[in-house]
Every structure is written in structure tokens, then in C-alpha cells.
Amino acid sequence: MKTYPFLLSISLLLVGASFSCKNDESNGLTPNSNSIELCGVKNPLKNLTWLSTEIQKFGTGESSQRLNGVVLYEYKGANVVEVQCGLCSSTNIHQYKCDGTLYDFTDPNIFQDYIKNRKKIELIFGTEIWK
């Protein structure tokens, strides 16, 4: 009979540990995303209106984080917020300035220079799908 309380204790410990290890998927955010500062704004996924709107297009939940991403790069001394969508083209139309306006990387040579010389700063949301 001594094994029953032991097994029950182990089972409860494992169940408790599995729930405590979850990230903040309930609101669709990457762990620690609330502590990130981007473009001078804390918690940019909620507080940068244009970025919040883009994130809402992804939906919520675990699949949203696996299929989409927001990555902060530095390019020529400026922040570039790259919104990576699993269902979108990986072309040069998803790179934003801090104010939400698109960078003009339509010239293939400029886009290749961006790809070659950008420096990854931080994954802001989800998964970096376009490396």
C-alpha cells in the first residue's frame, strides 16, 4: 500500500509540471514578448497599433506561432520589422519601419543587399520562417 501514495505523488507532480511549462499561447504571444521593447515601445505586439493589426491577421494559438513570425533586424543602422507569414510570399514586401510604413525593397539588388547585410536582433513573435 505504500506504493500507491508514492505513485499518486509522482503523477500529480508530472501533471503540475506539464501545466507550468506552457508559454503564453493563450494570447498568441511568444514567451517574454511582454518584456520586449521595439521602436521605443514596450510590449510592441499590443502597443504598436500597426504591428498588433498584422499579428491579429495570423489568428491565435500554437499553429499561429509555428506558421508565422515577426523578426527584428538591423539594416544600415535602422530597425527593420519583418512580418513573416506562412501563407504569404517570402518576397520583399513584408519589411516595415517603426512607424508601420513599408521599406521599398522592390529592386532585386537592394533586396539582396538587405538579405546579405541585415543583422538579426531578436525574434519578436512566433517562428523565424524565412531565414
Where are these regions (language model features)?
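Residue-level signal for glycine
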Residues: 99-100
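Bacterial Sec-dependent N-terminal signal peptides
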Residues: 17-41
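Hydrophobic protein-protein interaction segments
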Residues: 38-40, 50-54, 127-128
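Sec-dependent bacterial lipoprotein signal peptides
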Residues: 1-19
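Mature extracytoplasmic domains of secretory-pathway proteins
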Residues: 49-96
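C-terminal partner/receptor-binding element of secreted or periplasmic proteins
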Residues: 103-131
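Secreted/processed peptides and extracellular or luminal domains of membrane proteins
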Residues: 27, 45, 91-94, 104
